[in-house]
Amino acid sequence: GLKNEDEIVTNGTFTVDAAAQLQGKKSMMNKKGGKVMTGHENHLGMEKNTSSITISFNKNERIEVSEDFQNQLKTVFNAYIKLKDALVKEETNKSISASKKLLENISKVDMKLLKDNETHTNWMSLVKEIKKATTSISKASNIKEQRSHFKNLSLNLIKAIQIFGINTKVFVEFCPMANNNKGAYWLSKEEKVINPYYGDKMLTC
């Protein structure tokens, strides 16, 4: 049977088990435990221990929700990917459009699909932060400011996907040099690193 720190399987596919990976526990992509090496730790001679930046969760196990809710959350993720791609290309106007689409999609997520108070509370706390960061991106006039807010959006969407799951494979990626060398995470549909925090300057960092 599955333990809390093991992989999460949903309808034959798995969601990224970010908490397990980043805390060095066993996961689908890290069967034996221990820190997951992202390939960026020694980039440009810099050594950055991913354990210095952790994503905290109230629970390490995923909360069971309906497939309908997961599908609605997936539309938010898809809008996020378009926003991420716009940031990679440093297209400020497209970033604004994508952030507005993300806000539209998240407003359509039906909270009535969450059956108990704990699940509802978890979602409400995350959606508040997601909306706050995304709204800030939609109002930002330059790419640097957009990327700053994207960091917070990413952290909270990672948490949401970890807790509730979506029926697709998702990768959590990390750049140790972003956020003034404090590092920053983002989500991707592919394992290949394409950096939204630096664009052409360090595209594969």
Regions from the PLM with identified roles:
Residues 1-205:
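Intrinsically disordered, low-complexity terminal tails/loops enriched in metal-binding residues
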